[in-house]
């Protein structure tokens, strides 16, 4: 029995926390750095109208959206993103968790098609300290021009990987950000 259980352990997914069983989808939105909160609010109203379209999204039960900050910390493991006028966050409650993956894909396609100047990151709710589907890479060095060029090379290479989505840098419009 012990040997058999060791053999079966290879089939168990290797992750610290399982996927969340909450029927929720998280949508992170972003416009280019320097966009006013008023413009972000205007764009988000358009997103809300799209989400309210029951013919398009019949499985959306409700949603809450936030502009200028990453929303409240409604789950201990979810750390909101830093506040910025060009950022938004939406929590979507869906009626059927079995349709979550299809809903995420439909949201990605629809939102990106309808709002071409806006960036969307659409994910399922996660457990643990970070989203297990997300990979962060860091490019460091003393020369900002070289760092920027290398980061763009890396982005170009990542775009060639089948199934890779939401590839971006956090160097918004090459805007310097100083945190004190």
Predicted segment positions?
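Beta-strand-rich non-transmembrane domains
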Residues: 148-180
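Structural beta->alpha junctions
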Residues: 19-24, 28-39, 80-84, 91-101, ...
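Transmembrane helices with small-residue packing motifs
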Residues: 1-35, 119-124, 134, 161-165
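Short, well-ordered secondary-structure micro-motifs
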Residues: 76, 133, 179-180
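Short, solvent-exposed amphipathic alpha-helical segments in soluble enzyme
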Residues: 109, 138, 153-156
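Solvent-exposed, membrane-proximal periplasmic/extracellular interface segments of envelope transport
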Residues: 1-2, 38-130
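Residues at or immediately flanking beta-strands
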Residues: 62-64, 119-121, 134-136, 166-168, ...
């Amino acid at each position: 029995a012990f040997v058999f259980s060791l053999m079966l352990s290879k089939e168990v997914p290797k992750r610290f926390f399982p996927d969340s069983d909450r029927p929720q989808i998280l949508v992170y939105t972003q416009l280019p750095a320097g966009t006013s909160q008023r413009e972000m609010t205007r764009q988000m109203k358009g997103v809300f109208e799209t989400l309210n379209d029951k013919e398009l999204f019949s499985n959306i039960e409700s949603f809450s959206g936030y502009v200028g900050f990453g929303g409240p910390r409604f789950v201990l493991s979810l750390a909101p993103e830093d506040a910025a006028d060009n950022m938004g966050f939406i929590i979507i409650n869906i009626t059927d968790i079995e349709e979550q993956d299809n809903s995420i894909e439909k949201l990605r396609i629809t939102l990106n098609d309808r709002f071409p100047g806006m960036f969307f990151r659409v994910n399922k709710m996660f457990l643990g300290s970070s989203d297990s589907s997300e990979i962060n890479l860091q490019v460091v060095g003393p020369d900002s021009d070289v760092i920027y060029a290398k980061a763009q090379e890396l982005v170009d290479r990542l775009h060639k990987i089948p199934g890779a989505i939401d590839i971006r840098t956090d160097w918004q419009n090459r805007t310097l950000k100083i945190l004190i």
